[in-house]
């Protein structure tokens, strides 16, 4: 698999041109463009596993992917968009499990989650129930990989079953504006795939909100990626998240980073909108006085569908809106309404996904 590195600048320029055109009706300032590294930038990778027999009758294993157009499978020995740690682990893992019936039988997928801090989680997915014998072999595998110098976690998954030998997460350390921020990242949960671009996003968001007054509300906070980085720019931060594992990670990350002004609530953005509007009462909000928060800034990082109408109406009531988008088309759709009351103070393109059409962007909106 070869990357068209020589085309990177032109591909990024095309993304910037298209995003500029989408935002043009809303009179934004000049687009800030943050370029990615051209290779080994991705911290996660997932591969199907192909089982074959060589000419002398030995079982062979391969990482494979599928061509998006032809749907044909192809073998992946090295994966140049993934960071060096994943590439090193890919070859080491297959070499270590080759010929081991307990570890390879009905293994159909391997997921890798790595960090800039040097940790990696390897999740092995099976079409069979995992027993104590598998666990013993997996523990021996972990020890052999650690002997090679890997800081590795091994997780086995099957239908309605998950076995983490030690833990099911890695700990990332991101240098943001001169401070190291610690983030627990759980396997099979959402994390930003391009860690160095994530740092640029966090620093951009911090620079937008640097002289803010009052409190911050964040919807869809995940493991606290943004809210932890932004907390020192505000008096208090209130954040919502629906995923139980993400909330648990966020609580851990808050403690590890010494944040004392950030409260996480486990509820959806839609539910929080109902609570704010007094439509419903929620037991999860007992002990939390929403009236004690003076949230005049709101941060949203919605899914590809953008903000639903009720949330959009709620967001529009805030003086300042920081909107991170993974879909520029739904961002532009949402801006049709938001631009009636707010102006774009800053706009940015973050090239999270080089060599693809995907565009991550951000706008900083101030009430007119």
UniProtKB/Swiss-Prot annotation:
Where along the chain is the active site annotated?
326, 360
InterPro entries named among the record's database cross-references: MeTrfase_TrmA_AS, MeTrfase_TrmA_CS, SAM-dependent_MTases_sf, TrmA_MeTrfase, U5_MeTrfase_fam
Cross-referenced Pfam families: tRNA_U5-meth_tr
Question: Which EC number(s) does the record attach to this protein?
Answer: 2.1.1.-, 2.1.1.35
Task: List GO terms (cellular component aspect).
Answer: cytosol
Q: Name one GO molecular function term.
A: rRNA binding
The UniProt keywords, alphabetically, are: Methyltransferase, S-adenosyl-L-methionine, Transferase, tRNA processing
Catalytic reaction equation(s): uridine(54) in tRNA + S-adenosyl-L-methionine = 5-methyluridine(54) in tRNA + S-adenosyl-L-homocysteine + H(+); uridine(341) in tmRNA + S-adenosyl-L-methionine = 5-methyluridine(341) in tmRNA + S-adenosyl-L-homocysteine + H(+)
Q: Where does S-adenosyl-L-methionine bind?
A: 192, 220, 225, 241, 301
BP terms from Gene Ontology: tRNA methylation
Q: What class of enzyme is it?
A: transferase
Give the superkingdom in one word.
Bacteria
Cited PANTHER family: TRNA/TMRNA (URACIL-C(5))-METHYLTRANSFERASE, TRNA_TMRNA (URACIL-C(5))-METHYLTRANSFERASE
> What biological function has been recorded for the protein in this entry?
Dual-specificity methyltransferase that catalyzes the formation of 5-methyluridine at position 54 (m5U54) in all tRNAs, and that of position 341 (m5U341) in tmRNA (transfer-mRNA).
Family to which this protein belongs: Belongs to the class I-like SAM-binding methyltransferase superfamily. RNA M5U methyltransferase family. TrmA subfamily.
The protein in question is named tRNA/tmRNA (uracil-C(5))-methyltransferase
Q: Origin organism of this chain? A: Actinobacillus pleuropneumoniae serotype 5b (strain L20)
